[in-house]
């Protein structure tokens, strides 16, 4: 792991009026927004909209702009309201926007982004623009986009290519449109899963040579970066924000702890008390899921390959098992490993009738969904993102979000914890852009000082007051009174 040099930063419109013709419709739709956030289980638009691919529906925003592709630009007013609600719960990124917008630290930065497109990510995108960057954006997941939010970004003049329910072909088309545009060339990548990085490296190698740096926020994407580095193919510096303290210990853990319950409730109406659940993986995602479900009265089992994580699970009160020991009896299976084929067709053949199966990891390959597309099995879509899959003997399992990331496909997430991660991403982009040549072609972690700065941006929300070291104490501990307060090897 390369050591990252010390940072010097911060020493540190109107919608189409034909969309809403009656006040009663307007009230109902705004009510839908406030309660559902245009997530997968809620607003989907009219049947006409569902039948037409956005690729074939040429639209203009109120300024006449056409450099975008979203489901329906007419929903921009609803999306703007969602973004404003998120802003009120994202103190860190909003404070960063206020403090740095006059300096324009990203002036000249051309950022291509491939992340989830929801209200929280929209706050980050618009912050990057206010800090001086030009951006082009696509979604990293075909089911997590909030269509109204994408419309609001398009209305604001941001080139955004994303809608909920993209096909695989449309996904890559959108990402290609985000990367390539006449007269525009990216010099920074903000990635979630590594798809933008790999598409650019494969299809636009000349573009990739001009990249100043990559910021990656997911376990899957970070793994892909390290594989590139190991193979000598990573020719630009990259920052792994997934393993920064503020991302890993706050966004990853707390977001998953809250959203797993929301996802399961919205899609299945399950009562948790007494249900047997197996969590595959006990990293920060698995820890959050296990703790949350245990708190609701579930009997929780954990599977792990890492003896350290397994010991943590055991001492947290969970029984550590092999999947084959419990697969016939559990009511819910949750994957949280980032690995491949964690749940195989053989596992699914042995699940009990009515077993709920979902994935909380970024990778869509944790569950062997392709193995379920065989002639003898019957698929029935019973709700948005809820499929009943029936075996010839009448047994049925419930698959959520087709094995993709369930919390962002089937529910909403906490804006506050996303603010922590978004602040980290913004600072990482600023650092890479403002210090060309400082970093070699390697994968870096954020310095402790930057992590502490991000945390400090969020303390005022809780009226939290930090204790200050005396001169005697700082000398005794060998610390600067202004931080950093922990060594890089410290594990929180």
UniProtKB/Swiss-Prot annotation:
The superkingdom of the source organism is: Eukaryota
Which residues belong to the signal peptide in this entry? Answer: none
Region span, Disordered: 43-64
Q: How is the cofactor bound?
A: Binds 1 NAD(+) per subunit.
Identify the cofactor(s).
NAD(+)
Q: Which GO terms describe its cellular component?
A: cytosol
Coiled-coil zones: none
Entries under Gene3D superfamilies matching the protein: Adenosylhomocysteinase-like (3.40.50.1480), NAD(P)-binding Rossmann-like Domain (3.40.50.720)
Which is an annotated Pfam family here? AdoHcyase_NAD
| Residue sites binding NAD(+) per the record | 218-220, 283-288, 304, 360-362, 407, 486-490
Q: Which PANTHER family match?
A: ADENOSYLHOMOCYSTEINASE
The function of this protein is: Might play a role in the regulation of methionine metabolism.
Name used for this protein in its record: Adenosylhomocysteinase-like 2
């Amino acid at each position: 792991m390369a050591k990252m040099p010390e940072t010097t930063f911060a020493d540190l419109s109107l919608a189409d009026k034909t969309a809403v013709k009656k006040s009663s419709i307007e009230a109902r739709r705004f009510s839908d927004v406030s309660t559902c956030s245009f997530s997968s289980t809620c607003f989907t638009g009219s049947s006409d909209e569902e039948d037409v691919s956005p690729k074939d529906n040429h639209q203009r925003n109120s300024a006449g702009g056409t450099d975008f592709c979203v489901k329906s630009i007419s929903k921009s007013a609803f999306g703007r309201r969602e973004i404003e609600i998120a802003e009120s719960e994202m103190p860190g990124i909003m404070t960063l926007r206020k403090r740095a917008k006059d300096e324009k630290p990203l002036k000249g930065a051309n950022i291509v982004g491939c992340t989830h497109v929801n209200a929280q990510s929209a706050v980050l995108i618009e912050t990057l623009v206010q800090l001086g960057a030009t951006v082009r954006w696509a979604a990293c997941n075909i089911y997590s986009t909030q269509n109204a939010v994408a419309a609001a970004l398009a209305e604001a003049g941001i080139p955004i290519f994303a809608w909920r329910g993209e096909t695989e072909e449309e996904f890559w088309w959108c990402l290609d449109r985000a990367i390539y545009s006449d007269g525009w060339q990216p010099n920074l990548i903000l990635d979630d899963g590594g798809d933008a990085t790999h598409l650019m490296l494969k299809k636009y190698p000349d573009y990739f040579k001009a990249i100043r740096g990559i910021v990656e926020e997911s376990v899957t994407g970070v793994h892909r970066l390290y594989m590139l580095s190991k193979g000598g193919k990573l020719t630009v510096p990259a920052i792994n924000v997934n393993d920064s303290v503020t991302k890993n210990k706050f966004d990853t853990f707390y977001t998953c702890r809250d959203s797993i319950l929301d996802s399961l409730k919205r899609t299945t109406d399950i009562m948790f008390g007494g249900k047997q659940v197996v969590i595959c993986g006990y990293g920060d995602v698995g820890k959050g899921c296990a703790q949350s479900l245990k708190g609701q009265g579930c009997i929780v089992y954990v599977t792990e390959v890492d003896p350290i994580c397994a010991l943590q699970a055991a001492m947290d009160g969970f029984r550590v098992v092999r999947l084959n020991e419990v697969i016939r009896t559990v009511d819910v299976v949750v994957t949280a490993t980032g690995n491949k084929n964690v749940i195989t067709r053989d596992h699914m053949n042995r699940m009990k009738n009515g077993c709920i199966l979902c994935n909380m990891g970024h990778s869509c390959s944790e569950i062997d969904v392709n193995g379920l597309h065989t002639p003898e099995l019957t698929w029935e879509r019973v709700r948005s993102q809820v499929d009943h899959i029936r075996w010839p003997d009448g047994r049925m399992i419930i698959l959520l979000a087709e094995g993709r990331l369930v919390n962002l496909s089937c529910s909403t997430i906490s804006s506050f914890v996303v603010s922590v991660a978004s602040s980290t991403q913004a600072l990482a982009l600023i650092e890479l852009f403002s210090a060309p040549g400082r970093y070699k072609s390697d994968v870096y972690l954020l310095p402790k000082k930057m992590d502490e700065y991000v945390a400090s941006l969020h303390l005022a929300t809780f009226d939290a007051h930090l204790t200050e070291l005396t001169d005697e104490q700082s000398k005794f501990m060998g610390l600067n009174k202004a931080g950093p307060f922990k060594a890089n090897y410290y594990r929180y």
